[in-house]
Amino acid sequence: MMNIFTKREGLVLRESFSSIQTPHSTSNVLWIDLLHPSPAEVSYISQIFHLDIPTKEEREEIEQSARYWEDSESITINTYFLVSLFASTNKKDLHNETVTFLLCKDILFTIRYGEFRTFDEIQNKVLASPKNFQNGYDILSKIFEIRVEQDADMLENTAKDTRGLRSGVFGNQFGYDELLENLSRLQELNMRIRDSLFDKRRAITALLKTDKADIEVKKNLTIVLKDLNSLVEFTTVNMNALDNIQSLFSSQINIEQNKTIKIFTVATVGFMPPTLIASIYGMNFDVMPELHWEWGYPLTLCLMVISTMIPILYFKKKKWL
């Protein structure tokens, strides 16, 4: 699907694909948003605007030169946008989707294969306040601003869930399986947010060095960059909190294991004396006079009980139990 935004008589209009198929129809184009574009759409846009649109393989490369490059006429940016639901426990719903931004002759081209609330919001803003968007750089700057705000909201929700998980550990509100699942989910989400923030910070840092963007755009991007730096630091704090929960979880497991081992150890030591007594009288030699005593059997049982109680009472006195 292709959304085309053109500027006419002080207004921004959303138009169809046919609006750029006539001669000189591209002069008023402000932004072309390609959502799940077909090969034919990509090819047509490349030809009519003389663009070198990166392939899917090029979009997913992680080296710096593949995430941002600039020539005399255009700027290409590939950056991560996180696709996730806050409460989702299905890891398949959690991933970073690469969005491509192309800036050429003050026109913004976006190529994306995922639906983001960011783009719905920016489209409404562009249509409602056309004076604030004179060229593609203004739109790109606003997209980054909106997206970083949404990343901040997502990070705040992650931090809230982290605090709840920590309280649950101390309150024994979770079983081990549930706790481990929630911990893994939050660690994964925090890592994905961090990757997304790092990628945007790298793109904006490079964009601030270009001479193609005007001063106002750079001022806005500088503010966004400061917010990004704060959020990156927050992800570090959140990751440390999650690591602390993991340490508490591991310590709790060790304590439970030690308690179990202690019980078995006490039981083993406690039953050693009666076992020894039973073994002695189980030999059944004729020369063992106790075997022929009338009270030999009950006395032996009493002796076994007493020999069991003595080590247990000793352990309690030493506060080992």
Swiss-Prot record:
GO terms for cellular component: plasma membrane. InterPro entries: CorA_cytoplasmic_dom, CorA_MIT, CorA_TM1_TM2, Mg/Co-transport_prot_CorA, MgTranspt_CorA/ZnTranspt_ZntB. It catalyses: Mg(2+)(in) = Mg(2+)(out). One of its GO terms (molecular function) is nickel cation transmembrane transporter activity. A motif (Probable selectivity filter) lies at residues 282-284. It is a multi-pass membrane protein. Keywords: Cell inner membrane, Cell membrane, Ion transport, Magnesium, Membrane, Transmembrane, Transmembrane helix, Transport. The chain crosses the membrane at residues 263-283, 295-315. It is found in: Cell inner membrane. Signal peptide: none annotated. The record marks N258 as: Essential for ion permeation. Coiled coil: none annotated. Its main location: membrane. The central ion permeation pathway is formed by the first transmembrane domain from each of the five subunits. Mg(2+) binding strengthens interactions between subunits and leads to the formation of a symmetrical homopentamer surrounding a closed ion permeation pathway. Low Mg(2+) concentrations trigger both a conformation change within each subunit and a loosening of the interactions between subunits. This results in an open ion conduction pathway. In addition, this results in a less symmetrical shape of the whole complex. Homopentamer. In the absence of Mg(2+), interactions between subunits are weakened, and dimers, trimers and tetramers can be observed in vitro. Mediates influx of magnesium ions. Alternates between open and closed states. Activated by low cytoplasmic Mg(2+) levels. Inactive when cytoplasmic Mg(2+) levels are high. Belongs to the CorA metal ion transporter (MIT) (TC 1.A.35) family. This is Magnesium transport protein CorA.
